[in-house]
């Protein structure tokens, strides 16, 4: 998920995330080194197919380092395995909320999302969900770079996963962190956030794909090394 956080008039969701939940969020990975990898763009097959569970943790430390290095260089707040061509159920995230850093890796995650959030929004549903704002918060995606679209998400979710040490954890997230978890979890299901947009944005999405010659395998971009 791209780092560009944009609001349209207001943000109605609370970003409360308790210290107790933070302790359950899994061990914060020790991040040093790591290679910056190509980020694949919509059209690459791995982005549009469900990822497979991680069964071998022996090389996971290096994968995690590379994913963090790539995410920070992008820059982004989340990155899933399929985005770097790895069809495994793993994502990393790093999001600062006030003075609190939410950072970790989720391996073989499950995400509990309250009922009532549509798989794809209709224009009417979006209008009904936006009575206190002009439109829902916008999202961006490193696999659909340079664009942001409004998308309604569940205001709270529960993530259960394993960290890089194969230790299980559960975290209850609200607000923007909940949005990040939903966005990255979607990647593991073979879904991009643009697949969920209201129909009225489908023309813009198609035009973006045409203009950039996306929608075919092998398209990618490589983030630049961050300057010291």
From Swiss-Prot:
The keyword 4Fe-4S does not apply. Binds 1 Fe(2+) ion. Fe cation binds at residues 141, 183, 187. It is an enzyme of class 3 (hydrolase). The keyword Protein biosynthesis applies. It catalyses: N-terminal N-formyl-L-methionyl-[peptide] + H2O = N-terminal L-methionyl-[peptide] + formate. CDD domains: Pep_deformylase. Residues 1-28, 116-138 are annotated as: Disordered. GO terms for biological process: co-translational protein modification; translation. Keywords: Hydrolase, Iron, Metal-binding, Protein biosynthesis. Its EC number is 3.5.1.88. GO terms for molecular function: metal ion binding; peptide deformylase activity. Residues 8-18, 123-133 have a biased composition (Polar residues). The active site is at 184. Its cofactor is Fe(2+). InterPro entries: Peptide_deformylase, Peptide_deformylase_sf. SUPFAM superfamilies: Peptide deformylase. Removes the formyl group from the N-terminal Met of newly synthesized proteins. Requires at least a dipeptide for an efficient rate of reaction. N-terminal L-methionine is a prerequisite for activity but the enzyme has broad specificity at other positions. Belongs to the polypeptide deformylase family. PANTHER family: PEPTIDE DEFORMYLASE, PEPTIDE DEFORMYLASE, MITOCHONDRIAL. This is Peptide deformylase. The lineage of its organism: Bacteria, Bacillati, Actinomycetota, Actinomycetes, Micrococcales.
């Amino acid at each position: 998920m791209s780092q560009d956080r944009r609001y349209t008039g207001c943000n109605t969701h609370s970003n409360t995330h308790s210290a107790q939940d933070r302790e359950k969020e899994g061990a914060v990975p020790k991040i040093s080194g790591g290679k910056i990898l190509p980020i694949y763009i919509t059209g690459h097959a791995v982005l549009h197919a469900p990822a497979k569970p991680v069964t071998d943790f022996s090389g996971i430390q290096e994968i995690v380092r590379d994913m963090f290095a790539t995410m920070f260089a992008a820059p982004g707040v989340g990155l899933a395995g399929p985005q770097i061509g790895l069809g495994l159920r793993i994502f990393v995230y790093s999001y600062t909320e006030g003075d609190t850093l939410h950072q970790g890796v989720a391996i073989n995650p499950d995400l509990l999302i309250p009922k009532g959030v549509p798989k794809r929004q209709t224009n009417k549903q979006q209008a009904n969900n936006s009575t206190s704002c002009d439109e829902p918060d916008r999202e961006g995606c490193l696999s659909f770079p340079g664009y942001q679209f409004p998308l309604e998400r569940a205001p709270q979710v529960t993530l259960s996963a394993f960290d890089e040490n194969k230790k299980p954890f559960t975290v209850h997230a609200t607000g923007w962190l909940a949005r990040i978890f939903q966005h990255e979890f979607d990647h593991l299901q073979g879904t991009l956030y643009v697949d969920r947009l209201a129909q009225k944005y489908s023309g813009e999405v198609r035009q973006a794909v045409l203009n950039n010659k996306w929608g075919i395998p092998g398209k990618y971009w490589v983030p630049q090394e961050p300057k010291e």
